[in-house]
């Protein structure tokens, strides 16, 4: 399967632009990365807004839960028809809770993923890898956009490639580093790096990656 670009909506948090997103859709973009945060990352992001607008345009939505208070959040996004995939961070939870959450998402017909900080030892969570659909590897500290790519993520990326899992990488991806990453992952999340591209660059990226 070819690597897919997923647009992080985070740069549009305070300036949602439907016409811009419609132009991205016309360019070939189909997937939106939708960040949800709480005190786990000492920040806030989206709280359910704009999902109807994204559905109207035609986007599928991948929800990334960077939260400690997860049950109300996960139940809400499970109810949203254009949310196709949900990942949540492992760091706040026990293994028993992670198992419970995986089961909850799968029972509701969504793809489920586990998300990891680049400082988290991926190998410790290997027992879950046969029960999930994908993993999200953070290549920046979670909690805000526009950060620089941290090559420490390659430690977890090498481990992840030993397993039959879809891999999503999130944070600091730009045109100057995408080539060293794309061969190892299935989904590349881009936010500010995508917005800064000229239209022809976006179209080329979406067609050739």
Swiss-Prot record:
One GO term of the biological process aspect: pentose-phosphate shunt, non-oxidative branch
Has keyword Transmembrane?
A: no
Q: Which domain of life is it from?
A: Bacteria
Which residues are substrate-binding?
8, 64, 170-172, 191-192
Reactions this protein catalyses: D-ribulose 5-phosphate = D-xylulose 5-phosphate
PROSITE patterns membership: RIBUL_P_3_EPIMER_1, RIBUL_P_3_EPIMER_2
Its Enzyme Commission number? Answer: 5.1.3.1
What's the record's note on cofactor binding? Binds 1 divalent metal cation per subunit.
Enzyme class at the top of the EC tree: isomerase
Quote the cellular component terms of the Gene Ontology held in the record: cytosol
Q: Which residues bind a divalent metal cation?
A: 33, 35, 64, 170
Recorded metabolic or biological pathway in which this protein acts: Carbohydrate degradation
Which cofactor is recorded for it?
Answer: a divalent metal cation
Name the InterPro entries for this protein. Answer: Aldolase_TIM, Ribul_P_3_epim, Ribul_P_3_epim-like, RibuloseP-bd_barrel
Record family assignment = Belongs to the ribulose-phosphate 3-epimerase family.
| Chain's role | Catalyzes the reversible epimerization of D-ribulose 5-phosphate to D-xylulose 5-phosphate.
NCBIfam families in the record, alphabetically? PRK05581.1-4
According to UniProt, the name of this protein is Ribulose-phosphate 3-epimerase
Q: Which organism is it from?
A: Mycoplasma genitalium (strain ATCC 33530 / DSM 19775 / NCTC 10195 / G37)
Q: What is the lineage of its organism?
A: Bacteria, Bacillati, Mycoplasmatota, Mycoplasmoidales, Mycoplasmoidaceae
């Amino acid at each position: 399967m070819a690597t897919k670009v997923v647009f992080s909506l985070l740069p549009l948090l305070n300036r949602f632009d439907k016409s811009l997103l419609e132009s991205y859709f016309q360019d070939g973009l189909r997937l939106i990365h939708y960040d949800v945060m709480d005190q786990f990352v000492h920040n806030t992001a989206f709280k359910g807004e704009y999902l109807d607008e994204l559905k109207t345009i035609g986007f599928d939505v991948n929800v990334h839960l960077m939260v400690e208070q997860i049950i109300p959040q996960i139940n809400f996004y499970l109810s949203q028809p254009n949310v196709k995939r949900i990942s949540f961070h492992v760091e706040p939870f026990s293994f028993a809770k992670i198992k419970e959450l995986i089961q909850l998402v799968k029972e509701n017909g969504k793809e489920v993923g586990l998300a990891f900080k680049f400082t988290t030892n991926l190998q410790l969570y290997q027992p879950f890898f046969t029960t999930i659909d994908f993993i999200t590897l953070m290549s920046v500290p979670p909690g805000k956009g526009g950060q620089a790519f941290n090559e420490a993520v390659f430690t977890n990326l090498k481990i992840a490639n030993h397993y039959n899992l879809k891999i999503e990488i999130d944070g600091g991806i730009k045109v100057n580093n995408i080539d060293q990453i794309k061969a190892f992952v299935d989904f590349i999340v881009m936010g500010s790096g995508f917005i800064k591209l000229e239209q022809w660059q976006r179209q080329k990226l979406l067609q050739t990656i």
